[in-house]
């Protein structure tokens, strides 16, 4: 049996995926501009000239620093439009923010994608809608609102358990548990975790499980100490959370019943740290 909730069943040639993107899209954060790289790049630029040439960008960074200083993980997110920035200012914002640990996509009902990238300052996100090249914005929050909305609006509240195929072992009680927990979950309730790495599930079990709860609209990847892939399923409040080692082998494969998994969320301490770091950057390079 292959370990991994979204691995293909035995004999299949391709992994299960609902998204029209390649693996390179989920791996985009590899080789991206890190916090150290962003600061090193800024250090080569003339701060006075930057402040004169990019007043809108500097003003935006100051507003973001003030906003994130008061942000809380459970509070509504705050949006900042980028439409008034010229090309130089847009590049400056990109250089300052860089690309952080969490990235992903949300599949929208019209078939397009929303691309999400956390900055090197945790809790500051860049969101781009594929349908409109100019519809790009920054968002301060635990996770972009579009992720929470898609998880709630583009999934099913309930599901039916069909006829279990021959060769199934444990899938029926697992599905019953998932259904019960998903229907009962409410914000504030602790997430429940089902660990497939230790659970005896046959390939038939896993295939039937995948077919029953289906893929959902959200793919997120977190690259901190190792890699974690977070996928929404087609059922509200049910997520696949997989951890990989350096060889890209799954070492922990779970289903999580609850809100957006915490591995993809910015926490209160992240906002505090990012506010302090951003203010230091502004003082050092734009004053």
UniProtKB/Swiss-Prot annotation:
InterPro entries: HupH_C_sf, HupH_Hydgase_express_prot_C. Gene3D superfamilies: HupH hydrogenase expression protein, C-terminal domain. Belongs to the HupH/HyaF family. This is Hydrogenase expression/formation protein HupH.
